[in-house]
């Protein structure tokens, strides 16, 4: 369990490297034991991919992830790196502004299609002979969390079809759900590499996030990158 509100953990560091800031939002994890629930897990991964692509496209420096942490909780994480506190807080505002834009305006259709195609390329049924250690890991996952895995081509096709049918509204709804848990608990980890004068208060993080939401939303136009056809050289 987590205490309600914002919890900030700061560590001083005098090595020559950037300061780092992580915002972690605990939220319920999904147990994948049916095609529907496995799709819900994959939907989370698809959302992370779509957000990451958008941030890269908008030149917003932030690494986004979502992974199981403990018990029945995942951590939805935004990670930043910067020269000092002011720089990090500016990045938080830019990130929250883009999250607000996605929640209100969604992803472009081409954005969703590209994210889906990227995601589907990594999905496959593992028909190879598994080591005993892998079987043990799978069994532990099943016993602890009831997670199951896709084991046939027909099941994978069902899953892929559901993923292909995903639209922006579905991803927006999931993003709103995850971000809503920020109002319950927000964990902030800060590695201060810029001295005591750059010590951070949790109120400053909240203020930076709120400022980003209040700022005018940026215009966004998505243009697909040209994919060069791979040249295949055949033997003479």
Identify the function of each model-found stretch:
Residues 32, 52, 56-61, 101-108, ...:
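Intrinsically disordered or highly flexible coil/loop and linker segments, enriched in small
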Residues 70-130, 145-149, 159-165:
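M16/insulysin-pitrilysin zinc metalloprotease superfamily fold
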Residues 33, 53, 59, 63, ...:
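Detector for Asparagine
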Residues 24, 48-82:
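A structural supersecondary motif
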Residues 135-136:
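Aromatic/basic-lined ligand-recognition segments
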Residues 28-41, 53, 66-69, 107:
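Feature marking long nucleic-acid-engaging regions of large polymerase/nuclease enzymes
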Residues 1-26, 32-33, 37, 48-52, ...:
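Proteolytic maturation boundary segments
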């Amino acid at each position: 369990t987590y205490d309600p509100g914002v919890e900030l953990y700061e560590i001083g560091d005098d090595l020559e490297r950037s300061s780092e800031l992580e915002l972690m939002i605990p939220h319920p994890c999904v147990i994948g034991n049916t095609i529907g629930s496995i799709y819900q897990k994959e939907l989370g991964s698809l959302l992370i991919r779509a957000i990451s692509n958008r941030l890269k496209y908008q030149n917003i420096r932030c690494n986004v992830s979502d992974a199981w942490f403990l018990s029945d909780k995942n951590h939805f994480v935004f990670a930043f790196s910067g020269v000092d506190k002011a720089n990090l807080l500016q990045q938080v505002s830019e990130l929250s502004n883009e999250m607000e834009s996605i929640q209100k305006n969604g992803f472009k259709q081409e954005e969703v299609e590209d994210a889906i195609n990227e995601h589907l390329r990594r999905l496959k049924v593992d028909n190879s002979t598994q080591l005993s250690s892998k079987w043990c890991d799978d069994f532990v996952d099943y016993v602890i969390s009831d997670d199951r895995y896709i084991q046939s081509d027909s099941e994978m096709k069902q899953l892929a079809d559901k993923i292909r049918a995903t639209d922006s509204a579905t991803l927006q709804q999931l993003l709103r759900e995850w971000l809503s848990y920020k109002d319950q608990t927000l964990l902030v980890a800060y590695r201060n590499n810029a001295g005591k004068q750059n010590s951070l208060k949790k109120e400053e993080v909240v203020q930076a996030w709120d400022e980003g939401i209040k700022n005018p939303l940026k215009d966004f136009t998505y243009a697909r990158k040209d994919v060069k056809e791979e040249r295949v050289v055949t033997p003479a």
